[in-house]
Amino acid sequence: MTPQGRYNIKYVLLICAVSALGGLLFGYDTAVISGAIGPIKSYFGLDAAGVGWAVSNVAIGCIVGAFAAGTIAGRLGRKKALLLAALLFTVSAIGSALVETFSWFIVYRLIGGVAVGLASAVSPMYMSEVSPKDMRGRAIGMQNFAIVFGQVAIFTINYLIAKGASEAWLVDMGWRVMLGSEVIPCLLFCLVVMFIPESPRWNVMQGNDAAALATLRRIYNGPYPEKVLKEIKDSLKQRQLEQRQKRKLDYRNDKAFWFIAFVGCMIAILQQATGVNVMMYFAPVVLEQATGNNEAALFMTIWIGVVQLIGTSIGAFLMDRVGRVPLLRIGAIGSAVGLLMTSYFLYQAAGLAGSEAVRNGYFILSGMLLFMLFFAFSWAVGAWVVVSEIFPNRMRSEGMSLAIAAMWVSNFIIGLGFPLMNDNTFLLEHFNGAFPMWLFAGCCVLAYFFVTRFLPETKGVTLEQMEETMLSKTRLEAKEVPVEMARANG
């Protein structure tokens, strides 16, 4: 039987697509601020620090949601955790669109951040647990495709709302319409998530083998449901032993856990350190500074999302064919080149006005698009795939929560720090907005060397054999547990 004949591809993609709606709301919720931040700045009278806080406060909620995700998904199950995220998204969208004070705006955006953090951890966790190993990269790639689709959708909606609108209307009502538009996908997610099955791995952890087998029989064909159930149960034996010995949460001397956690956290941090979310949050601000035209800047931002969507589709196709490590390395170098190109034309924008400024703005956009293309087919997809699959079952919930939290801590720092750098008088006079792009390009180079040194190839490795594969990059274990052996056993 061919690998494809072993499982029901359509069913796996269907339930993963439902889970990926959490990713769509993730992208929608985080990117909606890009078009609204100008009017919000005027409405609440914010300075550069206030703008940074308005944008980055969501990341604080994301950190809380990511840290809580392991406990919530472990106790309630992956399905109920996704439903909780959907409800929090809905509350945030309604509340942030109706507020009258900046304090309450922050509160409701923080609630949305908790939803994003929860969905960002649980959605890929669910997908990796219901997907056969040969489909895992493609299935989890749907998560990033959904994130980017949500971003493209809100970039387009923001542009259509702002097109032809007066500045006074945008300041008074426009930003509320932008934020409130999220209610529609929120309600859709609340509805459809109730129809997906619970993760078979979680059911096994709860002792509900019958429910796990029922789901596995819808995913796999022939004798494979029983075989996969046995693999899951075998992989949990060590964890059960540690529970009996009261070592479940004591990772202080667990070198394997800390090495894998180090790799997972660094992959998550480096994904953010490329500066991708500066493109998501502040592209209209950067482009408006360079062109002097807000409507043109919002229109250009749509193309950043479109290119990311195309790149994400390419990455989802290549991830299980080329492998994680080659794509991450190529993407890191290509992203650095795009950022250097962007920084060059930002530097050249000083003193330009009118049509010349708009023309130079399109050169800046070209650099952003080059960066986004390379980032999208590599780190946009690859970081999520790697973080969702490198943690073995015994440390899965805790490890993923730690890595996703690290991602959002770095997101917060960058989101808060960029407006301060971008408005800094000294940096503007000497670099005209190019300085942050140089920093991000340097981080891309660092990402290349980190992946080369610390990340083994995980393509085709089962979750049950992942720990041996990851430890093959350590000096002690590499000789004892070769990565080829781990793959051969898969």
State each model region's role:
Residues 218-228:
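Short intracellular "coupling" helices and adjacent cytoplasmic loop segments at the cytosolic face
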Residues 227-239:
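TPR/TPR-like alpha-solenoid helical repeat scaffolds
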